[in-house]
Amino acid sequence: PKCVAVGETGLDYYWKEATREQQQPLFRAFIRLACMYNKPVIIHNREANHDIINLLYEEKQNGNLRNLRGIMHCFSGDSEAVKQALDLNFYISFSGNITYKKSHLPSVIPLVPHDRILIETDAPFLSPVPHRGKRNESAFVRLTAQKLSEIKEWTLEETGKITTANARRIFDISN
């Protein structure tokens, strides 16, 4: 076994269990750790996109993150957030929330190039339709893949091959 990434780490302003001032130094430490060991960082972002992006750009400009790369886990941002994440050398991972009727994510998914897109379950949360509101499980990732296939106009097989190749690349996993 080997470590393939650092995280999930990030900023979460939704729960208010820890202040911004408490969270940000720890987040900086984790992203520096990922870069020190040349590992991708998996970023959790809940109501903190502005601070996460600014912090990453600031660290990168200070020369602390020469080999910064990672995954924007369970992405829920807008088109600007997609552009910023891609500029920072991140992959963008989507979960079951892309299947929700009122989700804005189907409009941003086309902005993500095929070589930077991933899917995930975020189990036990964010179950895709028709399981919304129930406990999520790994088997439901197929529903997320089907929705992604529909949006990207790929076959389900193409989606599987693309997202698997991307996961292998970002996590440096050989066949």
Where are the predicted features?
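Mid-to-C-terminal alpha-helical segments outside catalytic/metal-binding sites
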Residues: 33, 139-175
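Conserved, mostly hydrophobic/aromatic
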Residues: 8, 34, 73, 85, ...
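Charged helix-capping and loop-helix junction motifs
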Residues: 20-31, 50, 102-110, 134-141
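Short acidic/histidine-rich active-site segments
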Residues: 115-137
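Distinct, well-ordered alpha-helical segments
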Residues: 45-63, 71-74, 78-86, 104-109
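Active-site gating/metal-coordination segments in enzymes
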Residues: 1-40, 88-100
